[in-house]
Amino acid sequence: LTDRMSVNLELPTADGLKKLAPNKHRKNILTPMRQIQQGIRQGRNEVAIYRHAPDFVPAGQSTQMIVGATPESDYQIMAVAQGLYDNFELKRVFYSAYVSINEDKELPALHTGTPLLREHRLYQADWLMRFYQFRAEELLNEKRPNFNILLDPKCDWALQHLEQFPVEINRADYHTLLRVPGIGVNSARRICGAR
């Protein structure tokens, strides 16, 4: 049957949704997300009690948002994603760079779409939040609201936190190793396991 369910957020903020899709309401998007979350939890409980109970959407739920059609910063976008991961237990947030195809006073001008590199940086930052234990507010903040397009977010974070380096590889805990550019999840596990 269904492996994953997705309710698209469409735009990062309620203001953006109100501006570009006034017939859609944030509550009408978040309510089905909550229902899916509750179904997943109930399914987990049933599997714990009844070994052969069917698993409700085993791959979890996801959502998608268009970035660049409204003026939200990368920080705002990542904070929304963090909130969705924390409060709705989403497995994945997809980001889609806005591509202008129609002229409208509410939309960015034609041929001024969102750079695909921005979308790529959002995906990289999302990966850091899901697998490297970063929080949105560690990567960006209101004073520094957008990613450096020229650097991947983990390297950019390291340059902003030079006081945490160098790291003694033989003594650093797993969490610290995850923050070292060039060390991934598997390498951090191997380093900790080899001690």
Question: Which residues are covered by each model-predicted region?
Answer:
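Conserved AdoMet/S-adenosylmethionine-binding subsite of the radical SAM
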Residues: L1-L139
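Residue-level signature of tetratricopeptide-repeat
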Residues: A194-R195
